[in-house]
Amino acid sequence: EIYTLSLHDALPILASLLTNVSDNSILLGYNSYIRSSHLMSAGYTKAIGERGTWALGAQMLDYGKMDETDEQGSVVGSFSAKDLNFQTSYSYMLSDYWSGAITAKVLLSNYANYSSTALGADLALNYFDEAHGFSFSAVGRNLGGQVKSLYDDGVKESMPFDLAFGLSTDFANAPLRVSLTADDVTHWDDVKFIQHFVLGMDILPSSNTWVALGYNFRRAHEMKVADKSNWAGFSIGAGLNVKKFKVGVAYGNYHVAASSFLINAGFSL
């Protein structure tokens, strides 16, 4: 449950599942990203009546310090770069099987002496049949655009709108769940067909533990070196639930020289 809250910032498909998150929950997350980049997040959820759930979240992606150079490439100083995301989500159970969600977000970027502001929204719809362990989701991501341009000419850009779909199913006789996500559907012809998909598998040895494996076909293709993938595109994670406290860790390989480590901790008040 707590991982739905932590992941819905990166995968808005999961925002429609917030109705399954524990009431009055707090989550903190940290992700050591490529090289000196770091992603930090915090979130809170609260049940609204019998069918609604409200969530509030914030994320900061800090790219660290970088060398500032002149036209000849000589280092003349350093600068930092950050992205901030503040968002609120509301999820509602439309029926026993269907739920929907909307997320509104404010995005702030600061790169050296340049800054920008954008307003955006995500829409999500989920069908979940608990008796058969089947789920289907659809999302429209990044509706909106800049209200303050990053550039001196004042040109404002739209956010990169995207459609994504996902489905998952449990196995009646095995502690497994498999999932398939189709991403970047609005740019279907930009890459090969298979590169739009992400495969996932959850291993559920008990009600309090889980292990997850994932494979991103596009990342594996784009990050391979000399026709060798070096495990690019693979990710692995695990989690433990102990009463009101939940913790999860994950590792993803982006490139032979770049990987990512994520840790979440959540507590139900």
Where are these regions (language model features)?
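Subset of outer-membrane beta-barrel
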Residues: S6-L269
